[in-house]
Structures are given as C-alpha cells and as structure tokens.
Amino acid sequence: MRLIKVTGGLGNQMFIYAFYLRMKKYYPKVRIDLSDMMHYKVHYGYEMHRVFKLPHTEFCINRPLKKIIEFLFFKKIYERKQAPNSLRAFEKKYFWPLLYFKGFYQSERFFADIKDEVRESFTFDKHKANSRSLNMLEILDKDENAVSLHIRRGDYLQPKHWATTGSVCQLPYYQNAIAEMSKRVTSPSYYIFSDDIVWVRENLPLQNAVYIDWNTGEDSWQDMMLMSHCKL
C-alpha cells in the first residue's frame, strides 16, 4: 500500500491529489492520508469533496497512533530529498510493502501524462457558488481581455517564508507583471484577487480593474473558479 500525506490549503491539496491520481494509475493500492488534516486549522479543511465532488479515497486515524504506525511499518519517501526533475523515487518498485509519501508536488512533471484526467477532476461545482460569483462568471465569459491578477500577501510576508516566497510578494514584481501583460493583451481588463485588497488599491492603481473581495471563509474557492474563467 502507498499512503500520500495531504496538508495545506486548496491549491496544495490539488497538487497532491493530482499526484495521487498519477500514482493510482500505476499502483491501485494507494490512499490519501488525512490524519494531519484533523489538526490543521489554518485553512478550511479537506476541500476535494466539497469543491470538486471527488470520491472518498481517504485514510484517517488519530495522530499519535498514526505516528506509531508510520514509524514501525512505513518507508517514507520525501519529495524534497529527491533529485530535481526526477520521478525515480516515485516510480521505482520497492520491496517494502508500505510506503508513505510526503511532499507538495508543485510541478506538472508529476502528472503531465494524465493532464486530461486532472483537468476533468478539477471541475468546479458552479451550483455551490454564491450569486455574486455567478454574476461575475457571466461577465468574465464575455470579456475577451480578462486578465486575473492574484496578489497574495499575509503569510507570505512572514520571515519564515521570505527565502522562498518573499521576493514575489513585493510591489516591483506585480508592477513588472502588469507591464508585461500590457504588451501581450490589448486593453486588458484586470480582475484582482487578494487577501489585502486595501493595499492593492493604494499601491497598484489600475484604470480598468475589478476587485473581487466577497469570497471569504469556505467561499474562498470561488476566487479560483473565477480566475479559471479569465483569458489570462
């Protein structure tokens, strides 16, 4: 059996689930481990069922028991300890019967050969969207120059994240991105998503901008749905 640890918010869960789909293609006895999600309070829990109606494939036990079982019986495979751009550790055959995978798999190389299945799996359930998001969907589908601009601040500006993400959360990064997009799209319409809309309005004044600020809490996934309907 292969167990794949799930943690993080919706985006990370999607990467991990895509990795699970690929693993399942070659190794039918694979399950998703939600044990850590029982204690994860940063985001909104495991969202694959609620947002995408994906089937239940989970394994979940209490944390102390899980750690004992993991230590005694499972061989651990860590994404961060593997060679860059190498899938060998995930594809090789192991004699150890129980394998435990930890990582975020934030690259299409982990599931490029099943990209159609991944896209089909991540189909948003529009029936669960609120009225404002549904109205915005109609606008986006008619706007041929719709450009989504997601500006994440908050946790990414904390010192512990600075080495990996801090540099892409600074004003020049977004200014350069807007300048580049203006070269590629004639009269772009910017649909802006952010966890700090006030900062965006003050620091990135745009003439043709719509600020999406109503999807909070368990409705946060609707921002991603709206982004997927932008042309860029």
Give the residues covered by each predicted segment.
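A short, glycine/small-residue-rich beta-strand->loop->alpha-helix junction that serves as a flexible
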Residues: 5-15, 38-39
